[in-house]
Amino acid sequence: MAHYFVGDVQGCFAELQRLLAKVDFNPSCDELWAVGDLVARGPDSLATLRYFQSLGDAGKTVLGNHDLHLLALHGKLKRDKPSDNLTPLLNAPDIASLIDWLRQQPLMRELPEHKIIMTHAGVPPQWSLEVLRQESQLVSQALKQSDYLDALISQMYSDTAERWEPSAIGINRLRFCINALTRMRYLYVDGHLDFDCKQPPEDCTNPQLRPWFEFTSALRQSHTLVFGHWAALMGKVNDPKLKALDTGCCWGEYLTLWHLEKDQKITQKRLKKG
């Protein structure tokens, strides 16, 4: 069995298929792990979601911020933007099935035999593996409830839940987990989240900010962390135990696939329109 990890697909389905053809991906014996943000901006979010749903146990994804936003759009909590290219997906006859499938996906996944953890944006350095499991599970439980739109999705948008408070309860606790696992890039030196700076570290001019992965973390020492979200990094992190896989395909760059067993990255340039 081969394990392949793919960066933010964001509707770039043709590029994904090219990548999988390059490695002869076979869902009957291989697994495809996705760092989230399967949808938005690229030309074919519908085909992308249908494909991952069809993979069954051979496909493992986590939720990204755009995937959660899709839940809000489907629930009429947010307005669809033409630039997101999500109208065909939202109007699809099987949208209810796809949304139900998406709601079952977690915020983190583990591959214990290889000591790998996958999330969309990263893991707060304050968190142990036990805390990561616990907090992500709380969000997953909320997403699976029948009132998930009112109880979670309608309240998840907030920049105020930027600091980890172990004593927090209810929506504030869930908000921090969502913010950290799906939106995080930089932290202030005291450890609270910044939501504004998206530049690569070499271009960040705020001396109070550091990338989340530059903070001391026991989890980073014991595990390989696989993540996406931060396209400006273009996969460049100076640590073999960090796998940054978002390389900006939906922005005209390329899609990256990491073959775990060979520790090899394979890329596919964004295809030209038409």
Curated annotation (Swiss-Prot):
Reactions this protein catalyses? P(1),P(4)-bis(5'-adenosyl) tetraphosphate + H2O = 2 ADP + 2 H(+)
Gene3D superfamilies per UniProt: 3.60.21.10
Q: Which Pfam families does this entry report, sorted A to Z?
A: Metallophos
Q: Name one GO molecular function term.
A: phosphatase activity
What does the record give as EC number?
3.6.1.41
Task: Report one GO cellular component.
Answer: cytoplasm
Task: Keywords in alphabetical order, please.
Answer: Hydrolase
Cystine links in this protein are none
User: Does the entry feature the keyword Hydrolase, yes or no?
Assistant: yes
Task: Check the record and name the InterPro entries matching this protein.
Answer: Ap4A_hydrolase, ApaH, Calcineurin-like_PHP_ApaH, Metallo-depent_PP-like
Its GO biological process annotations read: RNA decapping
Q: State whether keyword Aminoacyl-tRNA synthetase applies.
A: no
* Entries under HAMAP family matching the protein: ApaH
Record family assignment: Belongs to the Ap4A hydrolase family.
Role according to the record: Hydrolyzes diadenosine 5',5'''-P1,P4-tetraphosphate to yield ADP.
Kindly provide the name given to this protein in its UniProt entry.
Bis(5'-nucleosyl)-tetraphosphatase, symmetrical
Naturally occurring in which organism (per UniProt): Shewanella sp. (strain ANA-3)
Q: Which gene encodes it?
A: apaH
